[in-house]
């Protein structure tokens, strides 16, 4: 419902965008890997899609009701929560690395494939590599 429409699959089951339930699917992946590879060391490199720093004015929001919270994208704020990241860090400790940073000037719309936005995405990737590249290499060096 956030980006992808609800879809019916062959057995008649209806599915919604997985980002609604697991915007950071690290915990689900870790749980499934433990089932498939019991007793094995499992490392998770979690690469985010960028943090879009949303600002909510405290003074104004104190007067909002439910409708105003939805108008100000409370779902987007909730989906960017670091709660899943914190739980993953607690469970996996040194076997978990999360890479995520500001999106900068990148347009967050998933369907913006303009040359200008693709250049911004490329620049963001290069900045992320400068910031996180060595950490990722060190982490994956098993």
Features from the language model and the residues they span:
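Patatin-like phospholipase
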Residues: 1-142
